[in-house]
Each structure stands twice: as structure tokens, then as C-alpha cells.
């Protein structure tokens, strides 16, 4: 890995960001060497800066961010990392890595070190599948020779062609590929196949490995640089160009979406200005007294389940930080979701079929669920180990606090309209006065985003719905009111008692515009709570001492958020979201529905990747699933089906 570290060091000189892809994380040795080299380089530059030694150095600007994308063919447990022997100089890095190690589930996992200057994206699963789902612009590729020489894998020639094709898709300008086998030479048919495949995809082999006919060489390293004969065609939605020379974004909305976007952009080194129409942040859907977060388990493990799983893992980290550092009310030590159809045995089979470990979720009996909750439950349950609850407004404040000086909140600022300008985008108030002009704008203002886009992209958010919800709150000592040790959900939800109050709910009424807290909705919430806890008498409790709150959820028909670049109003009949052209510098992050707490952290990170060009924290198929262009793509596919059947429909 020293060769890759040296190549990366050369590549990150004078750059804002360097992205390294490692085809096998192993026990983290390669990552730690890169991390150590990056930190030492930064410290050396700071020392030289203090001595004014960098005055004439054209690469004086230090690299701000090192991104390492590492394939993890086999899930690695924390104890495996602990037992890994490391040189003394690497031990401190190993300890930090162990402490940050996630409970691995299939898919991508993001870790951050050294005040976000070193970011690690772990891709857990078969290498070929994970590479095909990766969205990034890679500067340095490190290929472990055993990936090609392992006889258990496919034919080396076929695999080399597949790898080279993926590398060409991911390669940034001037990217370098380094293939090295630590145990033996990358030679013979394997070397020949890899060199030829790379050459065919626009990589130029370095002179020391240029002889593709000499299979007897003892050189065990192949080095190639990406110099394509023609510019490869990129999917417009995946261009990931930095559109702001100032690396600054204007965000409209200071709820869970807007605040998490500000935090995630700050992690990538960007600044932001957040416009909020109210006098403070989190005054609408994010202003409830409490809410839950957890994953989703489906036997098919489809896009909805996978996105929710990835999001819940990031949510747990965000909530723990908010509790520990910002004094926010909440807990991330478990949640119970009742299962009324499957037996614990069948539930366990689902978990095993999805390769999910107890660290993520367990199937437990009614007796076990009763013990954990303190209630007499009659159904089995999914125990989400990292699920929990939190005060949403507190989480919003935590996101903004983490963005720190990189983000400015402007309250009592109502954005009435949005228009294009030579400088990018102009935000105007009701009088037509200019509030701000920016190259990058993020609309994170729930359904109001659709209004701002009504002229630019009238169909982009037309499918969004407004759903009224009312939650109920009662004194915890109310006779007959159940109290649970853990958050309980299923038909409705029940939060643990907090400061003498118990929160439960909630109603769901599409198209209801009444803002009043209604007694009949309290009654509905009690009936729902009675069904959840299987205590019929709960439904008969009186409304004395009731408190409540109404808010509106912005919901997409497919019950997934909307995150990404805004598609152009008019374009060809394209049926794939990733191929649709976008308005430059205009993004949307909305439709968090009732899962704002669960989705906000990962949603913010996904939005930041769109804006800044950093590696996407989720797979390409999940990007498609939350892409604003998905609604247009579906209409196009519907039109194509109608045309095929002789019908006519409008897009």
C-alpha cells in the first residue's frame, strides 16, 4: 500500500479533495497508512507554513479532505480489528478506527475522522456489486492482486475487463490505478489481462509495466494513468461538478432537512446560509415534542427497506451526538416494533435471509418484548438495537451547532419566489426585493418547495402530498395510561415518559387543513394506543389533562424522500432518473414525511454529495429511488406503456 499512499500524496497536493478507492479493506492496514500519511503531510505543511517555507510552492494549498472508499467483501467485526497486530506508530489510528467501527449491515457505511478531514466509506458486500453501485470521482485506485489471481473467482481476463470498465466510469481526470499483490507477483496471464483491459479503457500503462508480452517479469506492481482518447459520457445526474467557486450554498428551510443539509455541507468544507420564515428553526413538522427513529425489515429487502436501514444507522449516530454534546432529550438504546403476523421463528428467517445481525435487529417473543417494555404485550416484536427517540427541534439545533461558523441562520426571512440570474439563482421576498443571490440553492422547505418550482419544474414535485398529523400528550401519572421503557411502535407509537409526560399518536389525514388540536383526534390516538398496547381500557380514558400538537407532513407517494438536482422542465423522453439533465446549482431536499428523524442525517449527507461532488454515501440504485426525477421517469414509462398498447397519455 506504500505505492498507493505515495501516489495519493502526489495527487492530493494542491487539491481540495482526494478520493482513493481500495478494492479490499482487509483489516484496515491500507486505510491507516493513507490516514497517517495524510495527517503527517498536513502537519508538515502547517510547520512549513509557520516558517514561511511554502511561499514559492505551487502546491502550497493543503488538501482539505481525504476520502477513502474501501470494498469490504466480508463483514469485519470490531473484535477482528481489535485483534489485528499493528506497528506502534499505527496503534493510535487503529484505536480510533475500532472505536468508530459500525455494526455492519449490507451496503455502504460512512465514518469520519480528524474533524471530518479524513472520511471513510465502507462498501460491505460482493466487490463487483458494490463497485457497480458506487457513485464517485476517484483519483487513485488500489487493486489488491489477489482480487484477480484468486482461482475461486471468475476468469481473470473477464474480471479484468469488468474492473477496467468500472474504473473508467469512476475515474477523475488523471486518475491513477495501482495494482499490487503483496503475497506474489501480478504476473503471467493475470498481468497481461489487466494491462490490456486498462489500455482498452483509456489508461496508459507506466513504462515499468508497459510490456504486456513479458509475462516473466518479477515486478509485482502495475501502474496506469487515465488518459482517455475521448471524454467518456457521464450521466448528467451523476456529473457531481462543484458549481460554486465560493463553495457556498443557500438553503431554504430550517427544519430537519435544512439543518442536516447545512451540517453535511459543512462536513464537506462548504458554507451555507439558511433562510427560515419563522422566528426560529424547527417551527413546523420538526417542532414536535418527540419522535421515533428505526429501520425497516422486509423479506424482499427492497429499496425502501435498504434506504431506511442505512438511514437509521446514521440517525442513531446523529442522535447520540445530539444527546452527548448538545443536551438534547432522547435515547438511542433500542426500540420495539410489534409484529402481528409473523412468528419469531419466521421473523428470524427473514433476518437471516437479509444477512442482518442482532446488532441491527432481533426477532423477540411477546414475553421478551414485555420484559423490555415493562408492558404485558401479546405480540412478538422487532427489537431495533440502535432505534430510539429524540426531540426533533433539539436534533435540528444540534445539526446547526455542528455546522458551526460554516452556517448562518437568517430567521424571519420569507422566500416568495426563485428566479435564474447570471450569478446563478436569486431569492426574492413578497415585495420583489432580493434576499440573496447564489450559485447553489437547496430547497429544504417541505411542500413550499413545489410552489417555488411551479414555473421552473412544475411536474418535479407535483406528486407530493400534505398529510395532517396530531399527536397527544398526557401526564404520565394518569391512571390507566401505559408507560413503556422503550419506544413502542406498530399501530401508532408510544414514547417513554419524559419529564412527567407521555407522548403518543399520531393521526394521519391527507388533505386536512385544520390547524386546531381536536378532541376527536385525541380519542383516535387513545384508540390507537389501546390497540398498540392491547389494553382496551386505554381507549376509555378521558381527555382531561390532554395536550397536543398538529403539523403537516410532506409525503411522496412512494413514501421515500426527495433528494437531488431539480430536473429541467423540458427534455427528451428519458425513463431513467440518472440520465435526466438538471438545472445547474438547484437542488431539493424534501418529503421527509413522518420519518424526518430517521432520514435527516443520511438525507443531508446524500444532498451534500450531490452538491459538492464527494462520494455518494448510498448506492446508485438508492440515489435513483430518492431522485426528484423519478416521478418524471415514471410518467415517461407510463406513456411508453400506453403507446405500446395503443393508448395516448400526456407526460
Predicted regions and their residues:
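S-adenosyl-L-methionine
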Residues: 82-133
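C-terminal substrate-binding/active-site "lid" region of AdoMet-derived donor-dependent transferases
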Residues: 151-228
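Short beta-strand to alpha-helix junction loop
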Residues: 178-180, 300-311, 340-344, 382-401, ...
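Active-site substrate-recognition segment that forms the wall
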Residues: 230-244, 250-252, 256-268, 277-278, ...
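Dinucleotide-binding Rossmann-like beta1-alpha1 core, especially the glycine-rich loop
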Residues: 291-372
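Helix-loop-beta segment of a Rossmann-like dinucleotide-binding subdomain
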Residues: 299-302, 327-337, 360, 366-401, ...
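Helical element adjacent to the flavin cofactor pocket in flavoenzyme catalytic cores
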Residues: 382-431, 435-436, 444, 448-450
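C-terminal catalytic lobe of FAD-dependent flavoproteins
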Residues: 538-651
Amino acid at each position: 500500500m506504500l505505492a498507493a499512499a505515495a501516489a495519493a500524496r502526489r495527487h492530493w497536493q494542491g487539491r481540495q479533495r482526494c478520493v482513493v478507492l481500495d478494492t479490499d479493506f482487509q483489516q484496515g492496514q491500507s486505510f491507516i497508512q493513507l490516514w497517517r500519511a495524510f495527517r503527517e503531510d498536513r502537519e508538515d505543511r502547517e510547520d512549513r507554513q509557520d516558517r514561511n517555507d511554502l511561499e514559492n510552492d505551487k502546491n502550497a494549498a493543503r488538501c482539505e479532505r481525504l476520502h477513502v472508499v474501501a470494498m469490504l467483501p466480508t463483514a469485519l467485526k470490531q473484535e477482528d480489528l481489535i485483534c489485528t497486530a499493528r506497528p506502534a506508530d499505527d496503534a493510535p489510528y487503529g484505536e480510533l478506527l475500532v472505536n468508530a467501527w459500525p455494526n455492519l449491515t449490507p451496503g455502504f457505511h460512512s465514518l469520519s475522522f480528524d474533524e471530518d478531514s479524513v472520511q471513510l466509506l465502507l462498501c460491505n458486500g460482493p466487490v463487483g456489486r458494490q463497485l457497480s453501485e458506487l457513485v464517485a470521482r476517484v483519483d487513485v485506485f488500489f487493486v489488491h492482486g489477489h482480487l484477480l489471481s484468486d482461482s475461486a473467482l471468475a476468469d481473470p481476463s473477464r474480471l479484468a475487463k469488468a474492473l477496467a470498465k468500472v474504473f473508467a466510469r469512476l475515474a477523475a481526470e488523471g486518475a491513477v490505478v495501482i495494482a499490487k499483490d503483496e503475497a506474489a507477483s501480478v504476473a503471467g496471464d493475470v498481468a497481461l489481462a489487466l494491462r490490456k483491459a486498462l489500455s482498452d479503457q483509456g489508461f496508459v500503462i507506466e513504462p515499468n509495466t508497459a510490456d504486456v508480452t513479458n509475462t516473466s517479469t518479477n515486478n509485482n506492481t502495475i501502474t496506469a494513468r487515465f488518459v482517455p482518447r475521448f471524454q467518456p459520457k457521464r450521466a448528467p445526474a451523476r456529473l457531481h461538478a462543484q458549481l460554486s467557486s465560493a463553495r457556498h450554498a443557500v438553503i431554504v428551510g430550517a427544519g430537519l432537512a435544512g439543518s442536516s443539509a447545512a451540517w453535511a455541507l459543512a462536513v464537506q468544507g462548504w458554507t451555507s446560509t439558511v433562510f427560515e420564515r419563522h422566528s426560529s428553526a424547527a417551527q413546523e413538522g420538526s417542532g414536535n415534542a418527540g419522535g421515533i427513529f428505526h429501520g425497516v425489515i422486509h423479506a424482499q429487502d427492497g429499496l425502501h427497506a435498504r434506504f431506511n436501514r442505512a438511514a437509521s444507522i446514521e440517525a442513531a449516530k446523529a442522535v447520540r451526538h445530539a444527546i452527548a454534546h448538545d443536551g438534547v432529550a432522547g435515547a438511542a438504546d433500542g426500540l420495539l416494533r410489534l409484529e402481528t403476523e409473523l412468528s419469531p421463528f419466521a421473523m428470524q428467517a427473514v433476518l437471516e435471509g437479509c444477512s442482518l445481525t442482532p446488532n441491527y435487529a432481533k426477532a423477540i417473543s411477546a414475553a421478551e418484548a414485555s420484559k423490555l417494555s415493562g408492558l404485558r404485550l401479546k405480540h412478538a416484536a422487532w427489537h431495533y438495537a440502535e432505534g430510539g427517540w429524540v426531540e426533533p427541534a433539539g436534533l435540528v439545533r444540534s445539526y446547526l451547532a455542528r455546522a458551526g461558523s460554516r452556517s448562518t441562520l437568517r430567521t424571519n426571512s420569507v422566500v416568495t419566489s426563485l428566479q435564474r440570474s447570471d450569478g446563478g439563482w436569486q431569492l426574492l421576498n413578497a415585495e420583489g426585493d432580493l434576499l440573496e443571490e447564489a450559485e447553489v440553492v437547496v430547497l429544504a422547505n417541505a411542500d413550499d418547495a413545489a410552489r417555488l418550482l411551479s414555473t421552473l419544474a412544475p411536474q418535479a414535485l407535483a406528486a407530493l402530498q400534505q398529510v395532517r398529523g396530531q399527536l397527544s400528550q398526557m401526564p404520565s401519572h394518569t391512571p390507566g395510561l401505559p408507560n413503556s421503557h422503550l419506544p413502542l411502535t406498530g399501530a401508532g407509537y408510544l414514547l417513554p415518559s419524559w419529564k412527567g409526560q407521555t407522548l403518543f399518536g399520531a393521526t394521519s389525514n391527507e388533505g386536512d387543513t385544520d390547524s386546531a388540536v381536536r378532541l376527536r383526534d385525541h380519542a383516535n390516538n387513545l384508540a390507537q394506543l389501546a390497540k398498540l398496547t392491547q389494553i382496551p381500557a386505554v381507549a376509555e380514558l378521558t381527555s382531561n389533562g390532554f395536550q397536543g400538537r398538529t403539523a403537516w407532513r410532506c409525503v411522496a407517494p412512494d413514501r421515500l424522500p426527495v433528494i437531488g438536482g431539480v430536473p429541467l422542465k423540458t427534455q427528451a423522453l428519458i425513463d431513467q432518473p440518472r440520465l435526466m439533465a438538471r438545472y445547474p446549482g438547484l437542488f431539493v431536499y424534501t418529503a421527509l414525511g413522518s420519518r424526518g428523524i430517521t432520514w435527516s442525517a443520511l438525507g443531508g449527507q446524500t444532498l451534500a454529495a450531490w452538491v459538492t461532488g464527494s462520494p455518494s454515501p448510498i448506492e446508485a440504485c438508492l440515489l435513483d429511488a430518492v431522485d426528484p426525477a423519478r416521478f418524471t421517469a415514471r410518467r415517461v414509462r407510463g406513456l411508453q406503456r400506453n403507446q405500446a398498447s395503443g393508448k395516448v397519455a400526456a407526460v
